[in-house]
Each structure stands twice: as C-alpha cells, then as structure tokens.
C-alpha cells in the first residue's frame, strides 16, 4: 500500500516531477531525459497502469483519494495529497481532473521490431502538435492500426497533452522512431510494406481506387498540419492516396483525415 502524504508547500522537492507542466519547452526536454511522463485523470492513469507502466508517484486533491483508492492500495509509490490551490501552484494550471501520476517510461522498440508482426502501420512526418499526435493515436487504436512510426522531429506521444487527448490510447498502440528521414522509409519498404502517402494532390488516387484494405502490408504516411508531407517523403512513397472531398472543401485537419484514412486502410468502403 502506498504512503499517503499530505503536502502543503508547493516548493516541496518531492513534487518536482509535477512542476511547470505548462512549460512546453522545459517538459519536452526534461521528461524524456529523466525517463518520466505525466498521466492526467482517472481513466488515463488506470490505462497507463494496465499497460504496465511503473508509477513513480501520484498527486491528488482530497476528493480524488476515494475514487483512486484501489489504485493507491496497490501502489508501492508515494501518493501526495494536496489542495487544489497547491496543485495549481505546482503545475501551473488548474488541475480540474484532480489526479496526476508520474510514470516511468519504457524503452522504445526499434522500428524493425515493430514491423515484424504488423500489417497496418502509421508513419508520421513532422507532426509536432501534441493535440494532433494524441488524436491520431486515439484513431489508430480505435480503427485497428498495428503500430506507429515517427520521424525524428515528431512530437512526443507521452507528453501530457498527447496522452490526455488520446485518452490513454498511446499506451495501446506500440510506436518507434525512425532514426533517419526519409532514408528510414527504406527499411519499412524492405519489410514488405507498400508506402502510401496521404495527400490532397489531384494526382493521387482515391482510397476506393487504391483499395489499400486489400493490400498485404500497408504503411500510411501522414504529414504535419498545413504543410502536409514533404517533397522528399512524397518521392519516397510507392503511391499517393487522397480522401475525396465535397462542397468545395480541399482538405481536413490531420487528425480527422487520419481517422478516415485508417478506416479505409483497415476496412475499406462497406459494400452497398
């Protein structure tokens, strides 16, 4: 059973894992370096625990202690009980979900390790918005994608905002970082995958025409919001695919486009 420790001083060094959570640049560098990430909210904390992540500590306001009692009773890690005011001073924002947990990161698998057993893979290039990362992981989990590969400059899937938006789906879909870009795509092709680049370009085939759900192994490439895939990535692809649009709309945001594309890749259009 975890020790339940009441903390009244926001400067208490035991709360260091939770300081400055709104400082994106600080947390982006600090969390991977220290091997930690922050899970926020009851559902996300439970999903991280179920996925086998080790908990370093928890930070709770009083009303959440009973809600999380079963988790607390199983933990060897300390649980810090604080007032909402202290929580806000420590983290830099109003913790309206009332529960935070500092989790230990796991070593990432290599891309080749993930590709051995996968058939439907997401490949992201330069997606550096944490909200988009979280949304894409949530859709990938819901729609049956097997794994995610990230270019070296993609945002951290375990950053607090990414985890929160994904509702913990980042714990369900394994991911790895390609060491080089776009050269790293060669290893994906060598593993037997067809590289499909998602683009609104008129030269791309529609998903109905390409029928990726009938292909043996597919790696669907997604670019950043606004810019899309780079020229180098498009050149490296085996084929370009697009989502047909109506009513003068020329594109969707990357999160919405990803969900549509994942359905096309895993299932295809239902037969009428």
Locate the predicted segments by residue.
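Glycine- and other small-residue-rich loops at beta-strand/loop junctions that grip anionic moieties
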Residues: 7, 37, 125-126, 151-152, ...
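Structured adenosyl-cofactor binding patch, chiefly the S-adenosyl-L-methionine
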Residues: 99-101, 139-143, 157-170, 231-272
């Amino acid at each position: 059973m975890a020790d339940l420790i009441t903390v009244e001083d926001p400067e208490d060094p035991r709360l260091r894992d939770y300081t400055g959570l709104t400082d994106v640049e600080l947390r982006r560098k600090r969390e991977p370096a220290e091997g930690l990430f922050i899970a926020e909210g009851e559902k996300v904390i439970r999903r991280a625990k179920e996925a086998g992540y080790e908990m370093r500590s928890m930070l709770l306001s009083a009303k959440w202690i009973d809600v999380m009692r079963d988790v607390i009773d199983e933990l060897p890690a300390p649980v810090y009980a604080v007032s909402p005011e202290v929580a806000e001073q420590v983290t830099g924002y109003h913790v309206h979900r009332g529960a935070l947990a500092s989790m230990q990161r796991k070593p990432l698998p290599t891309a080749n390790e993930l590709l051995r057993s996968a058939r439907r893979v997401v490949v992201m290039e330069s997606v550096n918005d944490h909200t988009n990362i979280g949304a894409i992981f949530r859709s990938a989990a819901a729609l049956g994608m097997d794994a995610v590969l990230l270019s070296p400059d993609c945002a951290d899937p375990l950053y607090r905002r990414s985890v929160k938006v994904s509702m913990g789906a980042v714990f369900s879909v394994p991911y790895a970082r390609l060491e080089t870009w776009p050269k790293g795509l060669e290893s994906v092709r060598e593993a037997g995958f067809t590289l499909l680049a998602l683009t609104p370009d008129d030269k791309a085939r529609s998903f109905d025409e390409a029928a990726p759900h009938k292909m043996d192994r597919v790696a669907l490439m997604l670019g950043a919001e606004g810019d899309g895939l780079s020229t180098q990535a498009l050149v490296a692809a085996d084929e370009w695919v697009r989502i047909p649009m109506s009513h003068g709309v020329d594109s969707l945001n990357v999160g919405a486009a990803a969900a549509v594309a994942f359905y096309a890749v895993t299932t295809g259009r239902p037969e009428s």
